[in-house]
């Protein structure tokens, strides 16, 4: 009986140890599976996160544009974009000249710049000093400071209507950054009177602008702009 009892105890112990071993294997397997699952999730997330393409702005000076102002503006743009390339001085195209008002059609200047575009994700902008105009605000030929079409990637700006456009002029930089904002898909901003994307509506308001509002800023940061 004693031998039989001991035998039974040994059998129970063997079964118990076997069950522990199985449980341990299951825990290890579960842990490995969980670890592998987490690793796969991280890999999937990394695949989804795509860094914005390098943002390059190509700057052209139309004949007669102030060199000092242009260089200072390019220096400021360097803090916002990955790369800013000065592409040289170019003549005003005859096709853009509007003789009745002795000025240039902005849309035709932009079309001229568009033909010079370097890359599909790059931005092109022309700095002009002569008066420019466009069909806006119910007028066929309305004098403006800058022009582009939303997401066109190409713009033109002029110092003709910018007050005190000297080498250190901050208003001209605000004008440039406003038009480049349009090239990246931003409409005129109604959230803040101090946002760079506020609509001038035919008035001079550049001195009132201080920064992009949070909404406009978030939009541009997603597109690779370096904004604080």
Locate each region found by the language model.
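Post-signal peptide N-terminal segment of mature Sec-exported envelope proteins
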Residues: 38-52
